[in-house]
């Protein structure tokens, strides 16, 4: 009677054993290709191994790959792309950051890191990265889209707070009114103006209806502030 359960258990474990063997075999092929200087073939094997077991493949990267070698960046890119596809943004960010450390001014790496930080809810860090991207590439589309929307939305929040606080005053004095108007003026130059600069660059690259609507709103706010 015990033979049948043991047989069933062995059937269940067999795919796991075969998978482990397949992963080991593929990783051996990766190592052999790297040693032979066949980087393209190594990347192809590595990609196949990721599909079999991404955790084992990641462990191989950390323990077996020379981080100063040319191929290490290519393998890190494969892991980053795979984790991004799986929506594991923490791991994807880890590998994009690994790439960024090797090339701090690489716009593609910065853009990928910034995107992952947005997905991870780290908007402040993404803001810093996108601002650095614009220092390197002023017309970068992704950076201008993010910054245009970020500055506009934060400006709207601050404007609403200014207006709410002012409306709480039952009989505002001239000094309080002047302070309110000065707050609006500073908000426009520090936030709305930055949003406009970025969104104008966006619509130069492609006709965005939403970006144009936001620019129209900013123009109305500018007239309100300067009246």
Regions found by a protein language model. Give the residues of each.
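Canonical tetratricopeptide repeat
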Residues: 62-64, 78, 112, 146, ...
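Short coil/turn linking the two alpha-helices of tandem helical-hairpin repeats
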Residues: 57, 119-121, 148, 153-162, ...
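N-terminal leader/linker segments that initiate helical-solenoid repeat arrays
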Residues: 18-62, 69-74
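Conserved structural position within tetratricopeptide repeats
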Residues: 51, 98-101, 132-135, 197, ...
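Short coil/linker segments at helix-helix boundaries
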Residues: 58-70, 153-198
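TPR alpha-solenoid repeat register
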Residues: 58-60, 75, 109, 143, ...
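Short coil turns that delineate tetratricopeptide repeat
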Residues: 54, 70, 104, 138-139, ...
